[in-house]
Amino acid sequence: MKGQETRGFQSEVKQLLHLMIHSLYSNKEIFLRELISNASDAADKLRFRALSQPDLYEGDGELRVRLSCDKEKRTLTFSDNGIGMRREEVIDNLGTIAKSGTKAFLESMGSDQLKDSQLIGQFGVGFYSAFIVADKVTVRTRAAGAKPDGGVFWESAGEGDYTIADITKPERGTEITLHLREGEDDFLDDWRLKSVIGKYSDHIVLPVEIETRSKSEEEGSDEEVVTWEKINKAQALWTRNKADISDDEYKEFYKHLSHDFSEPLSWSHNRVEGKQEYTSLLYIPAKAPWDMWNREHKHGLKLYVQRVFIMDDAEQFMPNYLRFVKGLIDSNDLPLNVSREILQDSRVTQNLKGALTKRALSMLEKLAKDDAQQYQSFWQEFGLVLKEGAGEDPTNGEAVAKLLRFASTHGDSPAQTVSLEEYVGRMVEGQEKIYYITADSYAAAKSSPHLELLRKKGIEVLLFSDRIDEWMMSYLTEFDGKAFQSVSKADPSLDKLADEEDEEQKEVEKALEPFVERVKTYLGERVKEVRLTHRLTDTPAVVTTDADDMTTQMAKLFAAAGQAAPEIKYIFELNPDHALVKRTANLGDDGAFGDWVELLLDQALLAERGTLDDPNQFIRRMNQLLNA
């Protein structure tokens, strides 16, 4: 062998191999599914490349993957005639995990979490699953279009390093030989192999063939005759009639498609004929991928044109807020030589995207209606992503809004379980708007003084504490004809909720007019306005913003993104019935008066923002007033 060298695995590969071998052992037969799935992908890629370069078939266009056993050597070999790999591709594909953030993710996980097979499965372990049952793996491969002496040899015991070399390989494709560990001989049994392949890979388009040996029927001959028996249907699952496909087949196809170990929550298989002809098979996963928030996270549908594989991760067919949807689309209206650039500008693509988006949203609506518990499980995994749809997809705004879930004052749990339809159904007589509050946490939202009057009136308030919520509400302006209203903003509808003023209240307010003017004079330009309010019951003062001003939470979003935000000028609202306000109003000494006004304002700012510009000064002032 020429060019032989020993190279070390990328550190993440070593860690993942160790974890995978131990965490996936109880489900060890999945290595068959993963390796056959890889062979299927290799065949798909060759078919696509051969559309423009038919010579890549090298006279062998019958694509398949073959399994053969050697019981004496205790080896199991997978051999395909797909696209194959060059030396650089072998190093990239078998020596590294080309996923940004993998190392940081592995380091952030506790040992117990990393024993979770579903978590490990999120990495798309693929080829590495061979080491669950093998103590050594040998790969021989040659890329389509390369010369016979352009083959590559790769071998590893799945520990710290691997050997790579140049070899001569007459046939195109990849051959993977597993040297089985002690106790894994059942995978040398034909019946066992057929059973597992039938379970996991019946839906694979690529024919899966198993080697069978029998004695020659010619008289006097001792020769063995080798034949290849096809053991799967080898028909694209999505082209079959829905009535002929079992739930288990749909679930296994999802695992093949997504390399996810969990079963999907739901799926939708549809064939559309007419103005556009296409077949789609969409899945809603049960678990979010570990790198869903990574900018380089690949998402999108697998694209076929007239049953010919074109590309993975075609993100042009699904909006970004539905990036968790898995599946495929097989179109009859796109050209076979379609590129990502053509897809981006294609009217066909835009029409398909619109139809598939509505399909995915209807799947979620059906899940929410038929199984609230399952939908709640979905929301915990993907709710934050779905909230992006309020701003990204105004066309389907109402459909997205119906799928949103929030915490509210209706219950005592931070769980986001309340739909907008449920909220509207519970609105009290005379209530015109949907009230909400945004805060840094559920606890801060629930205990906000802005809720006092609404609680007294029995009016439900939605409690928002996710970072995205404030951004979302800049787009989500109404639902079912009802406008949304932040309770931390000044609004006439909130003032209307206060009890009708009696003569006594009017007299109190008139008597406090000089006090309000005195506070205004003292604070000057630090606040936008000072006024009395009847929206409070237990709190002496709050700060609010005008309807058109930036909110506190939005300013925090700007700051977190490193962007400058305009300074917020708050409206300082005082509760005329509170003892501390009355006490402050009766102070004649300007120094004491100033201290009490500062204390009331700082309390209001602390409740609104969660922080103060000078907390030490606030503490000193409070201690001083307590000792007075």
Swiss-Prot record:
Q: Please state what the protein is called.
A: Chaperone protein HtpG
Similarity annotation: Belongs to the heat shock protein 90 family.
Q: Name one GO cellular component term.
A: cytoplasm
Localization: Cytoplasm
Q: Where is this region: B?
A: 341-556
Which PROSITE patterns is this protein grouped with?
HSP90
Gene Ontology MF terms in the entry: ATP binding; ATP hydrolysis activity; ATP-dependent protein folding chaperone; unfolded protein binding
Name the Gene3D superfamilies for this protein: 3.30.230.80, 3.40.50.11260, Heat shock protein 90, C-terminal domain (1.20.120.790), Histidine kinase-like ATPase, C-terminal domain (3.30.565.10)
Q: What does this protein do?
A: Molecular chaperone. Has ATPase activity.
The top of its lineage is: Bacteria, Pseudomonadati, Pseudomonadota, Gammaproteobacteria, Enterobacterales
Instruction: Give the highest taxon in the source lineage.
Output: Bacteria
Q: Which InterPro entries match?
A: HATPase_C_sf, Heat_shock_protein_90_CS, HSP90_C, Hsp90_fam, Hsp90_N, Ribosomal_Su5_D2-typ_SF
Tell me what organism the protein belongs to: Sodalis glossinidius (strain morsitans)
Q: Write out the ranges of the annotated region (A).
A: 1-340
Supply the alphabetized keyword list. Answer: ATP-binding, Chaperone, Cytoplasm, Nucleotide-binding, Stress response
Q: Which Pfam families does this entry report, sorted A to Z?
A: HATPase_c_3, HSP90
> What is the first-listed, main subcellular location in coarse terms?
cytoplasm
Outline the subunit composition. Answer: Homodimer.
Chain spans, region C: 557-628
